[in-house]
Amino acid sequence: MAALGEPVRLERDICRAIELLEKLQRSGEVPPQKLQALQRVLQSEFCNAVREVYEHVYETVDISSSPEVRANATAKATVAAFAASEGHSHPRVVELPKTEEGLGFNIMGGKEQNSPIYISRIIPGGIADRHGGLKRGDQLLSVNGVSVEGEHHEKAVELLKAAQGKVKLVVRYTPKVLEEMESRFEKMRSAKRRQQT
């Protein structure tokens, strides 16, 4: 665990654990299958994604703030990590350069529509498309450390527009919810059209 005022860096700890696993394998004291399985997990993209999200969520809190605030940040980071480990679509950190060209994606949803905020479209040839880290159907969880969960659409738009240099997004892939949302919006549009005729 990091000392007070020190950022959480789990990568070093994971590397050390892998070194110790390799040493234990060479000793022959433990069946190699179990050690190799654990080593594969620690070296997996999944574990790396969980680590990134944990560190990112933990970093959003001011280190000099109260113990309660730090504990809350640690709890949120732990929940994100456990959600990922239980097979839920795990959150990922995506960093995009912010240029005059924009970010190359559209969002939909928000509190006023009683839905999460989603990436509804990746613009072909745009920054997000060229980067490849975002997918249509990604739920937007935070923008540069500011949570947009349960927020109005406009807040997410403002945060995205205000970003300079780079924008750091935390997203989670949940395409079924996006499909349900789009279907609901299409039904609402159809009902409006019928009322107008």
From Swiss-Prot:
Modified residues (N-acetylalanine): A2
Main location, first listed in the record: membrane
Domain L27: 10-65
Location in or out of the cell: Cell membrane; Basolateral cell membrane; Cell junction; Postsynaptic density membrane
Keywords of the record: Acetylation, Cell junction, Cell membrane, Exocytosis, Membrane, Postsynaptic cell membrane, Protein transport, Synapse, Tight junction, Transport
GO CC list: basolateral plasma membrane; bicellular tight junction; cell-cell junction; cytoplasm; glutamatergic synapse; MPP7-DLG1-LIN7 complex; plasma membrane; postsynaptic density membrane
Motif (Kinase interacting site): 2-13
GO molecular function: cytoskeletal protein binding; L27 domain binding; PDZ domain binding; protein domain specific binding; protein-macromolecule adaptor activity
Domain PDZ: 93-175
Domain of life: Eukaryota
Protein topology in the membrane: Peripheral membrane protein
CDD domains xrefs: PDZ_Lin-7-like (cd06796)
Cell membrane listed as a keyword: yes
Family designation: Belongs to the lin-7 family.
Function description: Plays a role in establishing and maintaining the asymmetric distribution of channels and receptors at the plasma membrane of polarized cells. Forms membrane-associated multiprotein complexes that may regulate delivery and recycling of proteins to the correct membrane domains. The tripartite complex composed of LIN7 (LIN7A, LIN7B or LIN7C), CASK and APBA1 associates with the motor protein KIF17 to transport vesicles containing N-methyl-D-aspartate (NMDA) receptor subunit NR2B along microtubules.
Subunit structure: Forms a complex with CASK and APBA1 or CASKIN1. Component of the brain-specific heterotrimeric complex (LIN-10-LIN-2-LIN-7 complex) composed of at least APBA1, CASK, and LIN7, which associates with the motor protein KIF17 to transport vesicles along microtubules. Can also interact with other modular proteins containing protein-protein interaction domains like PALS1, PALS2, MPP7, DLG1, DLG2 and DLG3 through its L27 domain. Interacts with DLG4 and GRIN2B as well as CDH1 and CTNNB1, the channels KCNJ12/Kir2.2, KCNJ4/Kir2.3 and probably KCNJ2/Kir2.1 and SLC6A12/BGT-1 via its PDZ domain. (Microbial infection) Interacts with DLG1; DLG1 acts as a scaffold protein that facilitates the interaction between LIN7C and influenza A virus protein NS1; the interaction facilitates translocation of LIN7C to cytoplasmic puncta.
UniProt cross-references to PANTHER family, sorted A to Z: PROTEIN LIN-7 HOMOLOG
Notes concerning its domains: The kinase interacting site is required for proper delivery of ERBB2 to the basolateral membrane.
Protein name (record): Protein lin-7 homolog C
Native source organism of the sequence: Homo sapiens (Human)
Phylogenetic placement of the source organism: Eukaryota, Metazoa, Chordata, Craniata, Vertebrata
